[in-house]
Structure formats: C-alpha cells, structure tokens
Amino acid sequence: MFRGATLVNLDSKGRLTVPTRYREQLIESATGQMVCTIDIHHPCLLLYPLPEWEIIEQKLSRLSSMNPVERRVQRLLLGHASECQMDGAGRLLIAPVLRQHAGLTKEVMLVGQFNKFELWDETTWYQQVKEDIDAEQSATETLSERLQDLSL
C-alpha cells in the first residue's frame, strides 16, 4: 500500500527517483516494472506496479468498444499507458508525452494512493489540495454511506 506525498525531482532525461521506502516493495511485487498513464479526470499521471495495472487492463478489456463512453476511457488509458522499468538507482523514465500531459518539468509530487501513485506538478498539486479543502468546507451535498462510516 502506498501512502503519503513526497516531492521528487525529474532529471534532465525525464527520470524520477523512487523514494527508498517504496523501492523494496516495488521490487518484490513487480520486479520494478511499472506502468504510467494519464488520469482522465485530473492533470496528473497514474503510476501502477505492473501486476496492479494488469488488473486494470482486464477490467478495461471487458468494456464495450461499441459504447462511445467506454471506448473513450479505453482509448485514453490504454493509449497513453507506458511501461517503465525501475533501474538499479531506483529511477523511472517517464515518457515525454506523459510529462507534457501533466505539465511535469522539474519538481514533482509523488502521491501514494493505495495501489498506485499519482504524479503531479508541484504547483498544480498544491492548487488541487486547496480546491479540495475549499470544496469540503463548503460542501452542501450529503455524504455517502461509506463516508459517513469513516471516522477520522
């Protein structure tokens, strides 16, 4: 399980160094093999260990290519999916088209989200956090049952 937000830097070749605390888990669970794709709702990337991505691919394969909405989701997620292998120094090369989609230049937030990471431009990440907090403070909608049961 991945959690927490960590500032990492992209080098001049577009590689980011995975924080040490995640490396062993990624090597054990995925032999360092990762898949990166776009997030279809936010200007960030999704970074999955390969076994987790394969579960997503199976679910995507069950969608109908005849349904325009389902086909669009397949096209966006699979069409942007890029395999990346963690090297001996714990670095991952993020494809240029993916970096461009998320506006990643130098400083990147690596955000743990259970079975995957999100990769955000640092400035965009903090803007999103502020928007999310503001939305929660002014929320008028009713909490779902699952959120009502969540006690923090």
Swiss-Prot record:
Coiled coil: none annotated. One of its GO terms (biological process) is negative regulation of DNA-templated transcription initiation. Transmembrane segments: none annotated. The keyword Repressor applies. Belongs to the MraZ family. Forms oligomers. This is Transcriptional regulator MraZ. It comes from Salmonella typhimurium (strain LT2 / SGSC1412 / ATCC 700720). The gene is mraZ.
